[in-house]
């Protein structure tokens, strides 16, 4: 989140402006930016005495092909992914420079299994249950944009398809969720 205030994040902020996101929305969804340096998070955590092996196991850093530790996400808009209890369990990252893949998620782990998580369920679940209404849209930016327009009972799968587990999860909060995916190719 702090990196969004850096000069290096100007490109990211320009993207958020083109998407017409307000500062309040950016804060609400705790959006961030991963630095242009491929090891800035690793270097910061090492300075705080975190152990390399623990950081590697956490999947927020990885070994590159030259066996150098680097941040898993860098030069990306960052979307924290929360479980239904509001705890961060992973991250999504969107490239802003045209590189592929456009979106990446944290690697699967014991606490992050994307097939079992709906983005924004932590914020949408109470309204969904109260109104028996849940909209499942395609991605992070769809959720955030709709939420900013006042549609708060909205979630998204963490990938190009809705899993059976995610559909079952939605039924815990709404008897008939509405699925509204884009008409274009996923991504």
PLM feature segments, named:
Residues 1-53, 106:
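Non-catalytic accessory segments of DNA primases and related replication-initiation nucleases
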Residues 35-177:
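Phosphate-handling DNA/RNA-contact segment within nucleic-acid enzymes
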Residues 182-186:
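Phosphate/diphosphate-binding loops
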């Amino acid at each position: 989140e702090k990196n969004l205030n850096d000069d290096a994040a100007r490109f990211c902020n320009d993207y958020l402006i083109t998407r017409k996101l307000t500062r309040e929305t950016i804060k609400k969804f705790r959006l961030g930016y991963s630095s242009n340096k491929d090891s800035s998070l690793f270097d910061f955590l090492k300075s705080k005495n975190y152990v390399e092996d623990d950081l590697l196991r956490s999947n927020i850093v990885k070994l590159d092909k030259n066996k150098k530790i680097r941040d898993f996400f860098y030069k990306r808009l960052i979307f924290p992914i929360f479980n239904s209890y509001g705890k961060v369990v992973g991250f999504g990252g969107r490239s802003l420079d045209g590189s592929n893949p456009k979106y990446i998620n944290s690697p699967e782990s014991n606490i992050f299994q994307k097939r079992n998580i709906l983005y924004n369920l932590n914020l949408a679940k109470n309204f969904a249950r109260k109104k028996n209404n849940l909209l499942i849209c395609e991605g992070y930016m769809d959720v955030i944009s709709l939420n900013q327009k006042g549609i708060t009972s909205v979630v998204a799968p963490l990938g190009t398809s809705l899993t059976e587990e995610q559909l079952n999860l939605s039924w815990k909060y709404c008897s008939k969720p509405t699925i509204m995916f884009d008409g274009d190719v996923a991504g």
